[in-house]
Amino acid sequence: MIHTLLASASIPLDKIQAKCGDPKDFNTKQKKVILYAYNYGSTKGLGYTMAAIAWQESCAGEYMVNFSDPSAGIYHAHIPGVIKKYTKYKDVSFVRNFIGELLMRDNEFASKVALENLLFWQKNRKGNYKEIIKSYNKGFSWEKNKSKNKSAEAYYQDIRMKVLKLRSYIPKYTKAYNNSLKIELEDKNQNIKNTLKDIQDSRKQQKNPIKKIESKDKIFIMPEP
């Protein structure tokens, strides 16, 4: 019966599978996630690492939850670990759901969790990058467990390769994003100037001219967040 239902309601996988293999194929949302992760981590010298982890764990924000871990967010933070470190609540289903939803909804909180975890291991492993990444993935467990060490080693190699690729692509993303933002702000400023001009012209027609803005009074247009 179950097989019949699944067959009759087959999921169009081609429509839900995101492109995760190469950053040049990322969509706009994925590029923004990668840039966000990079900018958040770059203040601590871990920008490319944060971006690589976001790419590795969630396909740059496309797959935000793993029920088997359970983990969630753009970096797939381990939910029980987040509950233990950042709350005083018991690890029960309701709290897991709440924290999971928070990690998926709030990229800043998810980034805080990921960066603090990396910084903890950076200190603990005395700056050994390979051990930092292996420990980020498996904690201390890889040290005395061959299977977990093999898994942690593979994770490190994945992150290392992604960092190398992102060193080529993130500067391009940043330049394209900044150009796009510049054009957007210029358009907004031009629209505001046009609106002010229309108001001035309208008031002139009503013989109630608008007071001219002195040259010393500069207009600054704050970009929207």
Predicted segments, located by residue:
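Non-Sec secretion/translocation targeting segments of pathogen effectors
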Residues: 1-9, 221-225
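Catalytic glycan-binding domains that act on GlcNAc-containing polysaccharides
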Residues: 5-6, 10-187, 191
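Low-complexity, Gly/Ser/Thr/Pro-rich intrinsically disordered linker/tail segments
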Residues: 175, 179-225
